[in-house]
Amino acid sequence: MARNQSAGRQSATRPAAVKAAKPTVGSKQLGSHGRDIEMFLGQFDALEQRRQIREGMEASIIDRVAKNLLNVPVQTLLAGLGLPSSTILRKIAREERLSPAESDRVARVLYVFRLAMDVFENETLAAKWMQLPHAELAGLRPLEVLDSQPGYDRVRDLLMRVIYGIGA
């Protein structure tokens, strides 16, 4: 009987260990700097993306998105997303995770970047578009309005209008 209880305990702890082993966006487990971004955008389904956001992406994703996707200083990305610089830079230095709210803002940048890539078919053009003021955003840059869901919705709408040939 003790053996069965022991086995039961082992199997009860096993799922937790498996869950802990799942890599999160920004972690070294997913490989090279671009691999985690690529996986989040292209290979993770909506439920896995949700899990990644709720568990918190690794803070290092901020550095990767700023430098490797958008070609902007980290401070520019943080300001655009309305994230506190000192807190996020500390999390990056300590290799900590972002909060779900912080991760959600980063995810919005990734979603918009992917959509901009679909429109412009070029990473450089997509990144530049996200940094240019737009009349339909009251002169703000798309990157500056991704700190809220309504801002994200507006930027997504602009890109969808381009895709479908409706004046933007």
Feature map (PLM): residue ranges:
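Non-transmembrane "mature" sequence context
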Residues: 1-168
